[in-house]
Each structure stands twice: as structure tokens, then as C-alpha cells.
């Protein structure tokens, strides 16, 4: 059982309260939007002269880019469109340029605060990766056309988020420009009759009788004679789907009409019979069809003679004998002020007659056009990025799962293990070597205080599980650490799953085998040095709410990225610092863990909440014997024999000492007392 004495809960409670106050006092701040300038737009589209940018808010926020009146495409922000958030919890913003044909013209990373990208990967390497999306044709399926650039191996999470943001935003921008026919199926075909097309909702219908018109034009100079005959029997619909257009017009006429369409255009058929003519005759002189308009919300488009296609007859034998058959090319590029064909819109034919009083009476006749579901193209649901990464890393996931299973066996069966010193040592060193080589250098499974900061910032700026699921190895380890904190405290990670901690312990074990003399730090100094790591943790967290960039610089006090993630492939100051820390660990076991590690300090804060307290103590500990104190891996046992849960890394060394009859002085005395003395000769 734990030794009685002065409680060490106060520092943890104070730090926890301080962090809570920081979180409550800092409201979420809206992130500023990065906007392109003309020079950047010109570079992204490869224009040979000045371009004009036009900010647009609907239907997709972005900037239209044109040159000499010709639309080059649109630029969008991945942060504004897809809310791309990096592992730092802050925006990862890329400006993406997409042509009307659905091709990515270029991309430029304009804002990021990722630790690896900021201080681990060269700007040229990042720029080359982002530029690798140039030329990707979004109209082609996955696996077709130009291959996507591979994520950067040392920054899989950050570059994976960049890739996902570019592709998602580019698809949205392309669809808004009419890619894929504005969501219209332009490929599928099956024979259909006029009755079939009406039953499917391919045409909107409006019928105004002569009697209805007579009432609407009461008082006209030339009155309308009321009757049941049609004043206007109107049908209108999108005929781009071959099932509609080819059956309606015949293969030859449909091919000719569809082939004349420009990107961002669709064909609308206006079919009518009755007294009133939707086209009229004025358009031949004015060039505009003043009687006809297409409306969607506040948007109104009046076609002109350049949009008009004359059709003499329909190919459907069961269609009514229409008096007028007209086709109009309709702008369906919402970014260029067009109709969105995926939403209902109206064909409005306005009939007018002069009144005897001198004014003019108007009768608007509406036929609502809807694209039937049968003719809509549903975008294939993209596999979420995090699922893609999990599928790719199944072998690594299996390795981590196996390690966690073995660790669970060790911790749940620790009483049996600690009674076998040689077995414990082999298991301990073997597991640490696996943690370093396989989990650390092999799978890049090193946790960092940056991830804690990212989590806290995400709670304030909009938490998304997808961001943290992108890296399955890190997610699994953090899940295990969370459970470990609940059951046993920080030692699950610090003592067993931290690659850098494993490197320190293995290096110190080798140093001791080589006879390197160890430095015993006085207890008073030892405890005061703890202040450094707790101060660093609070400073990094607090600074991140002010400036993530500066917080990441301070977080370089962790040599994890240099040693584990980057494998010493960094600038010499980082390598020199890492080597200095490791050198200190040769003389003081786990020197960095004891005094400098901000992540360990952060994990120590909730250590008092653990459920299990399976580390045994005896009344003699600290009073009659201090062997466990001198052998403790991180100096977590004080002179009174108490184990400080904030510092303990759960290495089980003290339990091995306590249960070894050949090592523990208490057990030795008991053995001597129990030994038979024999009779004197």
C-alpha cells in the first residue's frame, strides 16, 4: 500500500485549474481568409498577361478569374470551402485554381502552422508537393488520368490533409462551373415515349385556357373570347439527358444541338400550342426573346437569338402537335450568373395586351422545370481521407494492436512478472527495443505535446474527429494512453510506449554496462527541477492560443521530432540539442523525462485520477530501506518511500526489487530470521 505522508495532489490540481481557466478565458477567434492577388492568379492559371479577379460569394465562395473578358476559371480557398484543419488544430489553407473544364490549373499553400512543415520539411519540398496537383482532371475517375502526388512520408498527416482539401475544394469549384453537366446525366440512354417522359417528370407543364386569359385581360382593347380552347398549353424541360433529348428530337438533331453546347450550358426545350406564341416575332428585330425568361430565386435570365435553336418537328409519334418547338441554350454555370439545374427553376412566358385605358395588362405563365432523379448524376461518395489512411496502414495497425495487447498482459499480470527478475528484465528491454525501432523509427508512432495543443485548440475552434483519425498509429496510441491514464496513470506511455523514452533507457543501460558512473541528484534539487517541465507545458499551451507558430517553436524543446520522426535529418542546432539531451541521459537515467519533458508533465496532471494502485510498498520502505529509491528509473520515490504518481513511469523495477529475496533487505532479514539456528555442539 502507499505510504502515508504529505499529499502531492496540490500541484496537479493547481495546473489543472490553470489550464481550465485558460480554456474558458479564450474564446474561439474567427480565422482570417487568405485572398489571391492578380499576380498569384496569373501564375496559377499560367496566363500570358494581366488577369481580373472578381470575388463571388454564391453558390460557392471563390474568386472568378478572367482575361480580356474570357473566363479562365475560379480560385477557391480550401479553408473557406472544406475547412481544412491541420494536426496543429489550425487552418491549412491552399488556394486552388480550377478551369471550367474541371482541370486543376494550379495550387499554392498560403497558410499553415504544422510543426513538421514549419520546422521539418523544406519550403521547396512542400511547394513541389502542392504543385504536383497541377493538371489533375477532376472529370476522370480515381485511378484514371494523371496520378496524384504521394504524401510526404515524414509528414503524412499534414500533407494528407492538404491533398484532401485540394481535391474536395476543387471538385466543389468544378461542379459549380458546370463540370459533369451541372449534375446532369449526359450519357445514359433508353427508349422512351412522350407519355414515359411526362410520367418521369422530364417536362414542366402550364395550361391557360381562353377563359382564363379573358379574365386576365378584361378591359383589353382587343378582348379575348372565352372558351375551353388553350390560350397557351406550355411544356418545358431540360433535354440534355439522352433519354429525353434523343427520344424527343431524334439522334441526328439531338447530336447536333448537344454538340453545339459550350462548357457550362444546357439545352431547354420550350414546346407550346394555343393562341399565344411564346417566341412572338419581335425577337427577329431586337435579338431578344422579351416574352420568355428563366427564373430561379432572384436570378432572371432572358435568352437572346444567340441562344435559340430552331426545331421543325419532334421524333416522338405520341407527342402532341405543338405549334412552336424551341430550344434554348441556358447558362448553368452558377459562378457566371447561371441557373443551377440541380434545383427547380421556372420558365416564365409573359403574355401582354394593351388596355383600353392606355396601360398594359400582363399575364405571367409559369412552367416549373425539375431535373428528375433518374437523369441526375450523383457524385460517387469519396472515401473519407482517414479511412483511406487506415486501409493503407493495416499492417502497422496490427503491429500496434499486438504491442498494446502484450502491454496489457504485462500490466495485468505484473505480480507474476515482478517475481521473476530475469524474465522482467528481458521483457522490459525487449519491449523498449520494439517501441524504439518498430513503433518509433518504423511506424513514426512518437506522441508529442503538439498533439495535446492541437486537441485543446480544436475544442475551441471546431472539433473534428476526422483530423485526429488521419494518422491511425498516433490515434491508437493516444487511445491506449487515455485508457492507461484512467487505469494506471502516465506510466503506460512514458514507461512503455514512448520511443524517445525507450531510447534514453536503453542508452543508459548500455552506459551502465560499460561502467559509466551515474550521478545521484540530491532529492531537494531533484524536486525543484520538476518545475521546468511543468512550466514548459503550461507555456506551450498558453502560447498556442496567442500564436501557434511561436508555440511550435517553443515545442522544439521536445527532441522527439529530430530523433524519432526525422531520424536526425535536421539542421545541426536541432541535432546538437538532441545529442546533448541523450548525453545527459547516459549519466542520469531518463534525464529528459525527469526534468524537461512537457508531454510527460501534461500527462502527469490527471495522474491522480487513476483507478488502480497496484504498486506495493512496505512499512519499512524509506525508514529501514531506501534501495528502491536509489534504483528508481526516474527518481519517483522520495526518501520516505512514497511513490509519486506524477513521476512514476510504471517500469516495475521497484516491485522487482521488493519481491527479490536476494536483493530486498527486508526479505533478506526475514529469511535470516526464519532460517533454523541448529543446536550448539
Curated annotation (Swiss-Prot):
InterPro entries: 4Fe4S_Fe-S-bd, FMN-bd, NosR, NosR_regulator. Keywords: Cell membrane, Membrane, Signal, Transmembrane, Transmembrane helix. One of its GO terms (molecular function) is DNA binding. It is found in: Cell membrane. Residues 1-30 form the signal peptide. SUPFAM superfamilies: 4Fe-4S ferredoxins. One of its GO terms (biological process) is positive regulation of DNA-templated transcription. Pfam families: Fer4_5. It is a multi-pass membrane protein. The keyword Transmembrane applies. The chain crosses the membrane at residues 394-414, 436-456, 468-488, 535-555, 568-588. The keyword Methyltransferase does not apply. GO terms for cellular component: plasma membrane. PANTHER family: ELECTRON TRANSPORT PROTEIN, ELECTRON TRANSPORT PROTEIN YCCM-RELATED. To P.stutzeri NosR. This is Protein NirI.
